[in-house]
Amino acid sequence: MRYVASYLLAALGGNSSPSAKDIKKILDSVGIEADDDRLNKVISELNGKNIEDVIAQGIGKLASVPAGGAVAVSAAPGSAAPAAGSAPAAAEEKKDEKKEESEESDDDMGFGLFD
């Protein structure tokens, strides 16, 4: 990621085709040593490409990656129907859980395990 960021920084700074020397200079300015193999890989992949197009393609690829929230949303409607009939029981369980939590917090007498 550091090599891509340095390449983009050089390209956005006006250098349309940054070399390995340019990127090493950027990395050295913040105290990062460059790995020549990775650096050459980034340069070979990005050399000659329009940076704005590369960023737009990356955003498109990230948008197609599924997010973790979609699974929970799809499961909720199927489980909502059975839960509607047992709402009072669920409320009682929640009250019991709250009581148990308060008892557990008193067990340590206000002191945490690692304090």
UniProtKB/Swiss-Prot annotation:
Gene3D superfamilies for this protein: 1.10.10.1410
Keywords, in A-Z order: Acetylation, Phosphoprotein, Ribonucleoprotein, Ribosomal protein
Location of Phosphoserine modifications: 17, 19, 79, 86, 102, 105
Claim: DNA damage is one of the keywords in the record: no
Biased composition, class Basic and acidic residues, residue ranges: 91-101
Domain of life of the source: Eukaryota
Sites bearing N-acetylmethionine, chain numbering: 1
Disordered, as annotated region: 78-115
Modified residues (N6-succinyllysine): 21
Low complexity bias: start-end ranges: 78-90
Example GO BP: translation
Positions carrying N6-acetyllysine: 21
Pfam (any one): Ribosomal_60s
GO molecular function, one term: structural constituent of ribosome
GO cellular component: cytoplasm; cytosol; cytosolic large ribosomal subunit; extracellular exosome; focal adhesion; membrane
Family note: Belongs to the eukaryotic ribosomal protein P1/P2 family.
Protein function: Plays an important role in the elongation step of protein synthesis.
HAMAP family according to UniProt: Ribosomal_L12_arch (MF_01478)
Subunit structure: Heterodimer with P1 at the lateral ribosomal stalk of the large ribosomal subunit.
Stated name of the protein: Large ribosomal subunit protein P2
Source organism (scientific name): Homo sapiens
Gene designation per UniProt: RPLP2
